[in-house]
Each structure stands twice: as structure tokens, then as C-alpha cells.
Amino acid sequence: MSTTTITKAKNFDVETITYGEPQTNARGGKSIKIMSGGRAINLQFPITFTWGVNKWEGDNGAPDKFDMSLQFDKSNISSKKFLDAMVALQSKLITDSVTNSSKWFGRKKIIPEVAEAMWWPMVKYRKDKNTGEPDMDSDPSLKVKIGCYNGEWSVDLFDMTGNPTFRSRVSEEIAETIQGSKAPVDLV
């Protein structure tokens, strides 16, 4: 029986990242498991503000999707370390997509600029109203997917004392339980 190891985001080292083989889903899209030290990545985030869970209705019989944006607070040391870890992960994924372009994209070689253009950023900054460029002085956010497959949630939420506030395999009321809250998050 394996045990789950949870890493604090401030201790996360992108140099431990490894990848699984590309998998093709029923719709033809590809996904690649991202692992740390050969295991699933389980990160514990510092207290982070969120505007709640978003529900995106699936088209043509596709299942609904759920996500939430976590707001970084650059003035908070723990949050800044979490941000730095996510920016480092984002950079590593772009670099490794160039190295693995043949396996991942079926292209012999791509240049970093192409990989970056194909990439949808994980860490997002609001746009400057005048220039349309990212406002790097603002507090960025990180969008995370929340798994719900065939009505089964793949997320557990706990309060500050470690007591469960939401356990997986519960109804879609999760979207209403954490709206506008600040909570530490373990991303599995």
C-alpha cells in the first residue's frame, strides 16, 4: 500500500519533475502525467484567497468541468514562495516541451517561442488597461481544476484544524461551500 506524500509549496523542487507517457483521451486530446520523484504531485498551499468554484457546462454530452482561481498575495512570504514555485514549474514545462516535442506533439523540433505560444499560462496576471500587457506588479492567480467524474468528486477540503469540511463523493454543493473564502489548499 502506497502512502501519499504532501509537499509544502515552498519546498517544491522542479528539478524532481518527471513525466509519464502521453495518453490520448476519447476526444483525441493528449495528456501527460506530471510527477515529482516518480509519484503524483501533492502540494500544500499557504492560506490563499479564492472567489469560489466555477462550473463550466459540457457541450454535446461532455461532462461539466470545475475549476477555481487561487489568488497569490506577493506581500506574504509563504504565498510568494508558492508563486515562485509555480513560476519555476511553468518555465520547466515550457523548456521540457521543447526537449520532448517529438513525443508530446509529434513534431521533430520546436523552438521555445513556439512552445510558449502553444502554452496557456498557469500563473496569470491581470492585463494593463492601456497596454494590454500583463501587469507584473499585480497579484497573480493560479487556476486549478477540480475533478468531478461521473458525479464523483476527487477533492477533500479541511479547515485550519485539520477537520474535513468537504469529503469527496458528495453532491455539487462544494461550489457553494467555499465561495469567497480563504483556505489552505492541498492540491493532489
Each PLM stretch: what is its role?
Residues D128-V188:
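Extended serine/threonine-enriched, polar tracts that run as long, contiguous segments within proteins
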Residues M1-W153:
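OB-fold ssDNA-binding interfaces and closely related basic DNA-contact patches used
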